[in-house]
From Swiss-Prot:
Keyword check for Cytoplasm: yes
Residue numbers spanned by region Disordered: 198-260
UniProt xrefs under NCBIfam families: PRK00092.2-5, PRK00092.2-6
UniProt-listed GO biological process terms: ribosomal small subunit assembly; translation
Lineage: Bacteria, Pseudomonadati, Pseudomonadota, Alphaproteobacteria, Hyphomicrobiales
InterPro entries (alphabetical): Ribosome_maturation_RimP, RimP_C, RimP_C_sf, RimP_N, RimP_N_sf
Protein name, UniProt field: Ribosome maturation factor RimP
GO cellular component entries: cytosol
Record keywords: Cytoplasm, Ribosome biogenesis
């Protein structure tokens, strides 16, 4: 018997491992948080432990489609707080913060590099590639176990315009904020919000359209008795003659044109 979850793309994305992970204390928090998030239908993106203004533990999470709402963050915080209190991965008081990955998000999974192909990214390597650790350029997708990057940071003619960066050797990767990225993020956000509202019954489905509704497709326009097609929207009369006549009518000089 086939496992239904194996055919569900959301389950495949939930099970996809992160290739870029955190060291130290953040790794301990990630080991605790990831299973809880996955059980709720979310993916862990990044853990960041900061000592500024006290200790803050920031957990970035998302749905399999890359979206997340304020309600999701509240639900995650409510479920994760008691688990972290029991496991106690940090030996001092801290503030838990649940957030979205943001527009200029970290890239931590293979699907991230594939999804954002065509967008500008910055990549820092844990292992140097041809003597360099930092690269910037347009993502060109993934081939085998490496990210193809078309560089825009070339400084001399000896540098390669395209490089293949092994994903397991990447220490940090994130998108660069551009107008194109902002536009796509807004588009995806609107689509995700619309789908969520429709699934909750808050937003009715879109009305049928003649181009998509089979019942309306090919329906002829009504005709008059003489066989001519009924006119569509009649445009306003805006010839010079009508404008002059309207002005004279307004001044009371003449009667309107016959039939008008």
């Amino acid at each position: 018997m086939t496992d239904p979850s194996a055919q569900n793309p959301d389950h495949e994305l939930l099970d996809e491992p992160r290739l870029v992970v955190e060291p130290g204390v953040a790794a301990r928090v990630a080991a605790i948080a990831a299973p809880v998030l996955q059980g709720m239908g979310y993916r862990l993106v990044r853990i960041k432990v900061s000592g500024e203004a006290g200790c803050t533990v920031q957990i970035m999470a998302e749905r399999p489609d890359g979206s997340i709402q304020i309600e999701d963050c509240e639900a995650i915080s409510k479920a994760l707080s008691p688990v972290l209190d029991v496991a106690d991965p940090i030996d001092k008081a801290y503030r838990l913060e649940i957030s979205s990955p943001g527009i200029d998000r970290p890239l931590v999974r293979r699907s991230d590099f594939e999804r954002y192909a065509g967008h500008l990214a910055k990549i820092e390597m844990a292992v140097a590639h041809q003597g360099r650790k930092r690269f910037r350029g347009v993502l060109q997708g993934v081939e085998d176990n490496a990210v193809r990057l078309h560089r825009d940071d070339i400084r001399n003619n000896d540098d390669e315009s395209e490089v293949m960066l092994v994903m397991e050797d990447i220490a940090d990767a994130r998108l660069v904020l551009t107008d194109e990225l902002i536009a796509e993020s807004m588009r995806r956000g609107k689509i995700a919000e619309r789908e969520m509202k429709q699934s909750l019954g808050i937003l009715p489905p879109p009305p049928p359209h003649a181009k998509t509704d089979p019942a309306k497709r090919g329906t002829p326009k009504p005709k008059l008795e003489n066989g001519k097609k009924a006119p569509g929207k009649i445009p306003p009369k805006n010839t010079k003659e009508h404008r002059l006549a309207a002005e004279r009518l307004r001044r009371g000089d003449i009667d309107p044109i016959e039939g008008e």
